[in-house]
């Protein structure tokens, strides 16, 4: 198996010294650099760079700068996704994000883990686990999502949370480690939006 194949199979792989992976990361970093230095008002150029980075035709995806990712092609984005400023997608493992997802500033989605034994760690070994984000979710600022986590549809993750385990759908979850506080009523509202119906 190539190191890339090992990475995608969630096996230990050489993350630091494999030239093919180094080249793929360099490609993504160059595109991120260009995106981060493109005027926010130049929407056509930004759309072109975002599609090139993720190697797909995105549908109403908005990314505030600065933004960083390792590969880009291993991020699967739904439609109507908003990524606020200074977010990082560590996409050695696949990151799947559903439709209508709001991601606050300074959020990180970290698919990689390293050996605890520093001898192995110093040899460049790494393992990547997927992250799955359901549609209609919202992340407050400074949220960290760790490898192997699934966050269910319609959930809200409070600012500063560190998500180490799965979060069920329609949950309000906060903290370090992130825990469910209560369920969210995501039924279609029968009343007009006001201070009472917002909670």
From Swiss-Prot:
The keyword Methyltransferase does not apply. Its EC number is 2.3.1.-. CDD domains: LbH_MAT_GAT (cd03357). InterPro entries: Hexapep, LacA-like, Mac_dom, Trimer_LpxA-like_sf. Keywords: Acyltransferase, Repeat, Transferase. It comes from the Bacteria. Pfam families: Hexapep, Hexapep_2, Mac. One of its GO terms (molecular function) is galactoside O-acetyltransferase activity. PANTHER family: ACETYLTRANSFERASE YJL218W-RELATED (PTHR43017:SF1), GALACTOSIDE O-ACETYLTRANSFERASE (PTHR43017). Belongs to the transferase hexapeptide repeat family. This is Putative acetyltransferase SAR2635. It comes from Staphylococcus aureus (strain MRSA252).
